[in-house]
């Protein structure tokens, strides 16, 4: 049986480079690349996409839509790392752990849209609680997240790493118009009736995300406790290879969250911090924006689509 072929369209961007690095040396697939002079040639790109078993799109949204339009071969399967198709009903959302059986849905999908980095953490925290009836669909969700500057893409990396480090701003809060492009994605896949309030920021470090969601217990169904929220998440992710829920007893000793703690991995760590006296809970997610938030998730989805679970586990 011949090896499946994988073509990365946009393999010189931040995510594309990391996916290429993760796949380099794999003996269970053939990684197709174009010469430098042909990487932006639409004719050669279209040929490579249509000749691949799976094409991974690491492109800006408009270019990703264009690349999908190149497809004439009905056998080609696609993983899109852009945000172009994340709310489209005919694309499978590429977060394997978000629902029971969803990994199998991805495994058999023709079109998979890779989650955004921030939505990965927000949906991981909110969706299981909403599905269990512990978090009302109309809860006024507020999300804050800090990412390493690599979340801004190649231009942001160059700006931080090629200039005078002393001029780098320690923290840049953005999305102040409350219209970040990830909001519809979070709302849809977390099962929320209303748009969540989302305030992101970039820190003066390369990669890693810490995302938090404050919860007022008085706004939840009567009798719901922080312990129940934790139990729900712990149960949902009990068998997940790449998502871990910190034991409730351990959170009492945690005084800070390090956004860089899981850098270089495809893992995500969730936490539930409970203040029963004040009726408040803080949900948290820590993960690598370039790992579980991008390239790691894409490779995880690729392995599911290839039926290469053993290879994924070994990696």
Swiss-Prot record:
Active site, per annotation: 117
Which catalysed reactions does the entry list for this protein? N-acetyl-L-glutamate 5-semialdehyde + phosphate + NADP(+) = N-acetyl-L-glutamyl 5-phosphate + NADPH + H(+)
- For whether the record's keyword set contains Amino-acid biosynthesis, the answer is yes
The subcellular location is:
Cytoplasm
Q: Which Pfam families match?
A: Semialdhyde_dh, Semialdhyde_dhC_1
Pathway of action:
Amino-acid biosynthesis; L-arginine biosynthesis; N(2)-acetyl-L-ornithine from L-glutamate: step 3/4
Q: Which GO terms describe its biological process?
A: L-arginine biosynthetic process
EC top class, as a word = oxidoreductase
Identify the InterPro entries for this entry. AGPR_type-2, NAD(P)-bd_dom_sf, NAGSA_dehydrogenase, Semialdehyde_DH_NAD-bd
Enumerate the UniProt keywords alphabetically.
Amino-acid biosynthesis, Arginine biosynthesis, Cytoplasm, NADP, Oxidoreductase
Gene Ontology terms, MF aspect: N-acetyl-gamma-glutamyl-phosphate reductase activity; NAD binding
Q: Name one GO cellular component term.
A: cytoplasm
Q: By its UniProt entry, which SMART domains does this protein fall under?
A: Semialdhyde_dh (SM00859)
**May I ask which residue range the UniProt record assigns to the signal sequence?**
none
Enzyme Commission number(s): 1.2.1.38
Which positions are tagged coiled coil?
A: none
User: Which HAMAP family does this entry report, sorted A to Z?
Assistant: ArgC_type2
Purpose of the protein: Catalyzes the NADPH-dependent reduction of N-acetyl-5-glutamyl phosphate to yield N-acetyl-L-glutamate 5-semialdehyde.
Q: Which family does the similarity line name?
A: Belongs to the NAGSA dehydrogenase family. Type 2 subfamily.
Provide the protein name.
N-acetyl-gamma-glutamyl-phosphate reductase
Which species expresses this protein natively? Burkholderia lata (strain ATCC 17760 / DSM 23089 / LMG 22485 / NCIMB 9086 / R18194 / 383)
Gene name of the encoded protein: argC
């Amino acid at each position: 049986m011949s090896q499946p072929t994988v073509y990365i369209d946009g393999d010189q961007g931040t995510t594309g480079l990391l996916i290429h690095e993760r796949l380099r040396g794999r003996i269970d697939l053939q990684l197709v690349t174009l010469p430098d002079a042909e990487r932006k040639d639409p004719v050669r790109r279209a040929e490579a996409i249509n000749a691949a078993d799976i094409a991974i799109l690491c492109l800006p949204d408009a270019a990703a839509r264009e690349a999908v339009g190149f497809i004439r071969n009905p056998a080609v399967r696609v993983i899109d790392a852009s945000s172009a198709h994340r709310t489209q009903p005919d694309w499978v959302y590429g977060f394997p752990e978000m629902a029971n059986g969803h990994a199998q849905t991805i495994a058999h999908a023709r079109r998979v849209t890779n989650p955004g980095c921030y939505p990965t953490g927000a949906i991981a925290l909110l969706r299981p609680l909403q599905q269990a009836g512990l978090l009302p669909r109309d809860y006024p969700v507020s999300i804050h997240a800090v990412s390493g500057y690599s979340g801004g893409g190649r231009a942001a990396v160059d700006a931080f790493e090629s200039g005078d480090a002393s001029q780098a701003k320690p923290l840049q809060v953005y999305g102040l118009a409350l219209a970040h492009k990830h909001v519809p994605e979070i709302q849809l896949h977390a099962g929320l009736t209303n748009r969540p309030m989302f305030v992101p920021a970039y820190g003066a470090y390369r990669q890693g995300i810490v995302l938090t969601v404050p919860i007022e217990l008085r706004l939840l169904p009567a009798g719901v406790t922080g312990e129940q929220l934790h139990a729900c998440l712990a149960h949902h992710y009990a068998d997940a290879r790449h998502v871990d829920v910190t034991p409730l007893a351990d959170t009492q000793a945690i005084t800070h969250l390090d956004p860089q703690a899981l850098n270089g991995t495809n893992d995500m760590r969730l936490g539930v911090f409970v203040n029963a006296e004040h009726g408040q809970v803080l949900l948290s997610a820590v993960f690598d924006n370039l790992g579980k938030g991008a390239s790691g998730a894409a490779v995880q989805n690729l392995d599911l689509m290839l039926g290469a679970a053993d290879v994924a586990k070994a990696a």
